[in-house]
Swiss-Prot record:
Originating gene: pgi
Protein's name in the database: Glucose-6-phosphate isomerase
Keywords: Cytoplasm, Gluconeogenesis, Glycolysis, Isomerase
Organism per entry: Parabacteroides distasonis (strain ATCC 8503 / DSM 20701 / CIP 104284 / JCM 5825 / NCTC 11152)
GO cellular component, one term: cytosol
Gene3D superfamilies: Glucose-6-phosphate isomerase like protein, domain 1 (3.40.50.10490)
Length: 447
């Protein structure tokens, strides 16, 4: 079986291969730091060997719970924010039919999401669409007190209990939370919800291969065994024992850090496959939260191509030369669509007649790569044989491993996120939360 692979040839120009390979010692030292567990944030390294440590019994428990929800529910709402939401959304959007909710012969519940915003209209419309439907809830929160998911759960829990009664509701609610502590753990134990544990040593943005991601992905009918198998294979391929020249996570980390040192402050993750949009959203959180601190860090952005060539394409081609691209390039499609011949040929496209649409897309990808490289945009390519659970598992672990290496190379702790507390402190003060009286008085004086 093929694996995803990395090609940095088109990134060389701003930096040379020699410059990238000059980072070998540092990159391998950072991998060793990860594996030895003696670096910053070493209490959050549970993701490092997570794929290979998942047992068959754990997968079976998740699958059985998913089957219960699938048997009872036509809609399942996954409540979570950040890493408790984006990994699931990325996999489901990539592997389900693009128009899944319109299919008449669907075998799996519709997956909906809540708790990733505080939009009143969004919650109202979600509540309205759930009326009269058999629905369940997967509530994902380590503490149970994070504002966005806690609000959503309070509202949807009441709606579910009002609709089916507390006794039945408890069989349709699954809590994924801390093993012993927190408001959600307390509630789950009181109400008798089925629960899964968020490991203490796995941060949210690294949690997609824990029950946080695996349960809702299984509910959607996607093989979590294939997803985990892909991650296991990439765990082996990027191990500390794998030499730098063969270790794609190390080379990616070294290349992007060398580009950063040479003025490339923005990394754009691009794809030419519309189903990968939320892979990029997951990636942006992974790298943004991991590296953006201490006044440092590459800014992670993303584009969906060819769509965004008609909006951001101009900036990428001719704007400030502070960017580089990483392109996820998918080799094979799942379906075949041929361009038909049109007798009038008013659109002038008969020269494409008989070709697969993907051939047109591939030439757009190649032409774009050449244009951007000619325009001074270094281009890293991640080759993906096809969009499948196995290869997404590989992709997830590759980006996670490279993120840990890259953060250490940058000189930051890639496993904390102190900056996210600033807005929460202000929000609670403005909302007059008990215990924030002094902060409330101070912040209101500024308004």
């Amino acid at each position: 079986m093929k694996n995803i692979s990395l090609n940095i040839d088109k990134a060389l120009g701003t930096v040379s291969k020699e410059q990238v390979y000059a980072q070998e010692a540092k990159a391998m030292e950072c991998i060793a730091t990860l594996h030895n567990g003696n670096g910053a944030g070493n209490d959050f390294l549970g993701w490092l060997h997570l794929p290979s440590s998942i047992t068959d019994a754990e997968l079976a428990d998740i699958e059985n719970t998913a089957n219960v929800l699938r048997s009872k529910c036509e809609v399942v709402v996954a409540i979570g924010i950040g890493g408790s939401y984006l990994g699931t959304k990325a996999v489901v959007e990539a592997l389900n039919n693009s128009f899944d909710w319109l299919q008449n012969d669907r075998k799996n519940p519709v997956m909906l999401y809540a708790g990733h915003n505080i939009g009143e209209d969004y919650l109202y419309e979600l509540s309205e669409v759930l009326k009269g439907k058999q629905f369940g809830i997967i509530n994902i929160s380590k503490s149970g007190t994070t504002t966005e998911p806690a609000l959503a759960f309070r509202i949807l829990k009441k709606q579910l209990e009002d609709a089916v009664g507390k006794e039945e509701a408890k069989h349709r609610i699954v809590a994924i939370t801390d093993a012993k502590r927190g408001a959600l753990r307390t509630l789950a134990d009181q109400e008798g919800y089925k629960t899964f544990i968020i490991p203490d040593n796995v941060g949210g943005r690294f949690s997609v291969l824990t029950p946080v991601g695996l349960l809702p992905i299984a509910v959607a009918g996607i093989s979590i065994r294939d997803l985990v198998a892909g991650a296991v294979s990439m765990e082996k391929a990027t191990d500390a024992s794998v030499p730098f020249a063969d270790n794609m996570a190390a080379i990616y980390a070294a290349t992007r850090n060398e580009l950063y040192k040479n003025g490339k402050k923005i990394e754009i993750l691009a794809n030419f496959h519309p189903k990968l949009h939320y892979i990029a959203e997951w990636w942006k959180q992974l790298y943004g939260e991991s590296e953006g601190k201490d006044g440092k860090g590459i800014f992670p952005a993303s584009v969906d191509l060819t769509t965004d060539l008609h909006s951001m394409g101009q900036w990428i081609q001719d704007g400030e030369r502070t960017i580089f691209e990483t392109v996820i390039s998918v080799e094979a499609t799942d379906h075949s669509v041929l361009v038909p011949t049109d007798e009038a040929d008013l659109d002038g496209l008969n020269f494409l007649a008989g070709k697969h649409v993907d051939e047109v897309n591939k030439m757009a990808e190649l032409g774009t790569q050449l244009a951007h490289v000619d325009g001074g945009v270094p281009n890293i390519k991640v080759n993906m044989p096809e969009v499948s659970a196995f290869y997404i598992g590989q992709l997830f672990y590759f980006f996670e491993k490279a993120c840990g290496i890259s953060g250490y190379m940058l000189g930051v702790n890639p496993f904390n996120q102190p900056g996210v507390e600033a807005y929460k402190k202000n929000m609670f003060a403005l909302l007059n939360k008990p215990g924030y009286e002094k902060e409330s008085e101070a912040i209101k004086a500024r308004l």
